[in-house]
Amino acid sequence: MIRKILPTVAIAALSLAMTDIRAGQAASQTLEKIGELGKITFGYRETSIPFAYLGADHKPTGLSLDLCAAVADRLRSELHRPGLEIEYVPVNASNRIPLLQNGTIDIECGSTTNTADRQKQVSFSLATYVASPRWLVSAASPIVGTNGLDGQTVVVTQGSLNLTVAKKIIDEQKLKVTVIQAKDHAESLFVLGTGRAAAWFEDDILIAGLVANSPDPKTFRMLAATYEPSYYGLMTRREDPEFKALVDSVIKEKMGSGEFNKLYSKWFEGPIPPRGQNLLLPMSDAMKARVASPSDAL
């Protein structure tokens, strides 16, 4: 990428803007990069409905992207850069952390679970969703519980935290199960739908989003069993707590003003692109608690 050389006046204005935004803070490499290039780069998932995915116009959309857009709006104001641009870079479960670490993206706007292990590599914003993993099977399948998976093949998305969770369940219940991996959530659903796997294990909301936008949602059903909740957040670089603080302040402001609740209703309780499906998922008590008291705790 060719970097533009800023004129002296622009550099002076940028210096003043960076002084404003850093009042009481140490320097943020991410903010400096964004200010210098005049753009912020969003990493987004292409099939993580309704958090980040490609809509009817093949443009990135979703709850996480709405929140990231609010971060960009804050930067336009605080950096005095009304023309700040947004660049979109597709990421997947395998490359999202490396692309954040090497500076290809400035923030990941997806559906990534905050874990203690991942915190050794990246930082997470305040929780933006509380999920629980579940098994999805064909509606015609005789499987009603995890015992029914014995002797079967199941699919998990490559790079998903739920690969570890699925293997733990299989080991604890002493099941003989073959686990295969798909490159993304859309392929996982395809593998299940074509009969190459008897079940798909993933977070309930991601399953609901993909199924709702599939050609025939009634051909699938989730098993009743749920597991420990997980917390989604926007990912930022671990070595840049100042940028994380800015992102957190944007989310906290949205939650305090009631705007987050409106965004939640938009994506979980109303028709969403590309097919106008409604996920019909009211906010859970666990999510309500996080909105009332925003936190990035596990």
Residue ranges and their predicted role:
Residues 15-23:
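C-terminal segment of classical bacterial N-terminal signal peptides
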